[in-house]
């Protein structure tokens, strides 16, 4: 399946967070994992995200087996979803670029506070997902991670870290994916969705960041909301499309998601798009009321 949006898809399904995938891992069902990889590739995924859960920390051979099996089944490159330098090193060692047409894998992910993963860049070449949701601050001589809540904080972190990757490590802009955290709107009284969209606009307009990608997972945005919008549409899916309708023109170009969801731009008069835009203008209890308008006309 292709998407009318000009975006790339990173297939998210090889992850034990999905019950059906957890069963494949629990049963060591290699053929089932391969079939899931093929399904995502055939649905248009440009990369496949791989996360085998906590077992990655204790069973490197099993992880290498999974990576090899996936690469035997598909030719799309892989994204390794682990915060551990040790695990990432094992993933990169197991990955065979030749089976992906020479394409580099993605390390998912680094932050300013977790920069040690870049020590692997001398031994291996890879693309990287850079989390813009947290920054590092010096507090009494100690480096402390702080969450970003404003557009300027998100943009400042993204710019600082992306330029560091390019200038200190020689990483091409095209190999950098800035992860823009897309939060659930159900309890977003602080304008976090609005801050994310405003930050996307700032990053997309910065000539120093030309060529850098912006991405995110969209599954959180509709969490804990009813299945249907007030107009009868699939609320969660339509919300995801509303977010993309607003952000793809600003430079958001990659989605970590389920490839067969079929993201489509919404027309300007679409009920959910208009209700989401209204929500973005609100804060506090007014934002909560605006969320209810999505499913109560």
Where do the protein language model's features map onto the residues?
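Glycine-rich, proline-tolerant flexible connector loops at the mouths of alpha/beta enzymes
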Residues: 41-76, 88, 182-193
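Structural preference for beta-strand elements that scaffold enzyme active sites
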Residues: 4-9, 46-49, 69, 75-79, ...
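Catalytic alpha/beta core domains of metabolic enzymes, predominantly
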Residues: 119-281, 286-290
